[in-house]
From Swiss-Prot:
CDD domains (UniProt xref): GAPDH_II_C, GAPDH_II_N
Organism: Methanobrevibacter smithii (strain ATCC 35061 / DSM 861 / OCM 144 / PS)
Name of the molecule in the record: Glyceraldehyde-3-phosphate dehydrogenase
Catalytic reaction list: D-glyceraldehyde 3-phosphate + phosphate + NADP(+) = (2R)-3-phospho-glyceroyl phosphate + NADPH + H(+); D-glyceraldehyde 3-phosphate + phosphate + NAD(+) = (2R)-3-phospho-glyceroyl phosphate + NADH + H(+)
NCBIfam families: GAPDH-II_archae, PRK04207.1
Length: 338
């Protein structure tokens, strides 16, 4: 049973903590917060996690709020086999020095630059690259979504190049200080966006260019993907491959799943914790091969698709499972992923 510390108990961190707790080969030894808010309280009182603080000077604030703390982040990582770092992107470099000093392995999130660790991770496409290493980085939610489907398609279609338009949600549902609320914003207003180069960190040699924009919604991202392929394949072959791939769902707009709102409702119907949709939904009707070009549309639940990737990254770094598909299957079973 490996010991996992979660540094940063926010949107991703709290989900990773619950995912770790659901496994039978690892356990949560602590989570961290910097402020005594409702997440801090529920972590301790509802989830039963030991809570450590990232800013020791705020210990009195937690005491005044009546939230029990177990120590500092430095204390927490001493007991860990690996730290899953879910802190804001600007904190990563200084945390890395702390982890190195403590001699503990660490997994970062996609908000950090690839250069921080020199390794990026996706369970399907490059699990082996991080096996036994000290530090890696799970790529962002959008990059995870692109990589899952492209790495499934490539073996049968032989991808020549990819062009994708990323329609990004303006903010997460709980964020009240971000937007836009009445605008479409090129983000960034140049090509390429960072998503294409990020895909290249986990799919070596792929020719991919992306452009992105923000829209006034909070539910999910949506991708419009155009792929030039070398092999002659039928549309149904692409559909079959995507249907066989776990963590990808081929969904039918004709059955009432024609929007991101309906996909989120579907997650509720599945009884998912926090209404999470870990899988990447691809609209069946959008999948089309025309000559040497493949087109499809997909959605990404930005709060949760990277969560199972973090579990597999733990197994890779700690050499708990050498076969990526076995780790994926184990994670999926514990989390109820299709």
């Amino acid at each position: 049973m490996k010991s996992v510390a979660i540094n940063g108990y926010g949107t991703i961190g709290k989900r990773v903590a619950d995912a770790v707790a659901a496994q039978d080969d690892m356990k949560v030894i602590g989570v961290s917060k910097t402020r005594p808010n409702y997440e801090s309280r529920t972590a301790v009182e509802e989830k039963g996690y030991d809570l450590y603080i990232g800013i020791p000077e705020r210990a009195d604030q937690f005491k005044e709020a009546g939230i029990e703390i177990a120590g500092t982040v430095e204390d927490m990582i001493q007991e860990a086999d690996v730290v899953v770092d879910c802190t804001p992107g600007t904190i990563g470099p200084q945390n890395l020095e702390m982890y190195k000093k403590a001699g503990v392995k660490a997994i970062y999130q996609g908000g950090e630059d690839h250069e921080l660790t020199g390794l990026s991770f996706n369970a399907i496409s490059n699990y082996d690259d991080s096996y036994g290493k000290d530090y890696t980085r799970v790529v962002s939610c959008n990059t995870t979504g692109l990589t899952r489907t492209l790495s499934t398609i490539d073996p049968i279609a032989d991808i020549k190049k990819v062009r994708a338009v990323m329609v990004r949600r303006g903010s997460d549902p709980s964020e009240v200080k971000k937007g836009p609320i009445n605008s479409i914003v090129p983000n960034p207003p140049k090509v390429p966006s960072h998503h294409g180069p990020d895909v290249k960190t986990v799919m070596e040699g792929i020719d991919v260019t992306t452009m992105a924009l923000l829209v006034p919604t909070t539910l999910m991202h949506q991708h419009n993907i155009m792929v030039e392929i070398n092999n002659e394949v039928e549309t149904q072959e692409i559909i079959d491959a995507l249907e066989k791939r776990s963590r990808v769902l081929v969904v039918d707009a004709s059955e009432g799943l024609g929007s991101t709102a309906e996909l989120m409702e579907y997650a509720k119907e599945l009884g998912r914790n926090r209404n999470d949709l870990y899988e990447i939904p691809v609209w069946r009707e959008s999948i089309n091969v025309v000559g040497n070009e493949l087109y499809y549309m997909q959605a990404v639940h930005q709060e949760s698709d990277v969560v199972p990737e973090n579990i597999d990254a733990i197994r890779a770094l700690l050499e708990m499972e050498s076969d990526n598909e076995k780790s994926i299957a184990k994670t999926n079973k514990a989390m109820g992923i299709l």
